Amino acid sequence: MKEAINVTLRHCSRRFNQQVALHPLDLRVHAGETLVLLGPSGCGKTTLLRIISGLESSDPPGEIWFDKRNVTALPIEKRNVGMVFQNYALFPTLNVAQNVAYGLKVQGVPRAEREARVAEMLALVDLTPLAHRAIDKLSGGQKQRVALARALAARPKVLLFDEPLAALDARLRDRLRLEIGALLKRLAITAVYVTHDQQEAMALGDRIAVMEQGRLVQLDTPQGIYQRPASRFVADFVGAINCIAHDPTGQPLRFCRPEDVLLADDTRYPQRGVVVGSTFLGASQRLLIDIGLDSPIQVERHAREIWQAGQRISWSLTSQAALEFSC
């Protein structure tokens, strides 16, 4: 692969008629990192990805730079970016190898080099035995690997993912997420990955940019986003939270994660509560504990522990577990 580059966005924004899809923002994607754009539907993450790719233009005076080159006015075919879509965007009349080779053929890459690159990419995504298979004979996961191989074959400066795993079943999605993460680390290519799935974001991102209503609301490492969320929206969107203190005057409320609650079936902890329900999650269980607030809090416990509805408990928080936000 080519040497990794930095991607810099300066005062980029996008408005469609009277609707603001993306408020002005500055953002830098470091060379060789995977930056995940995370947020709910309609938050502006795909618009931002399309601006980076050249499929959309930023409203003036927004600029996009690849290292020291201003690519703002360049269309997608001049930016040398690779894109992987949710719907694969493969050609059904071409076989696996022909799909991977298509972009190289359009670029005028000589046949010998083209064949060598196709072989290299198919080996990279473990599809060599399927080189001559028809696209309609592939599974969803295999199709997404073909799409990834095709994007990488042109040796792009930047690799862009638009929710590539959203259409797959849960088990396949988990496996491909691991494979894509390992591949991105191995290639050390600059990548931007769009998703609404916080587990995907945590697993793949070197950093995560959380977006809300067209705004970038927090940019941090996965650990920073989860452990030090900048707002209640971020805390709520990335994992579960409990409200453990109400303040009707609008002062900061206190929250905690389900795994940060200490629980005992005796009186060792200062706070009291009652188990009102539980959900089995495989290796763990999620308990609902009534602590006298409007809603019960959630507590994460090992699945082998036995807790009964109606059981009285004591509880506390791990040190420095509480989060505070102004609401």
Task: For the regions a language model picked out, list residue spans one by one.
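The feature captures the beta-strand-to-loop junction immediately N-terminal to the Walker
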Residues: L38-P40
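Conserved ABC transporter NBD signature motif
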Residues: P61-N70
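ABC ATPase nucleotide-binding domains
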Residues: I76-G82, Q86, L90-A230
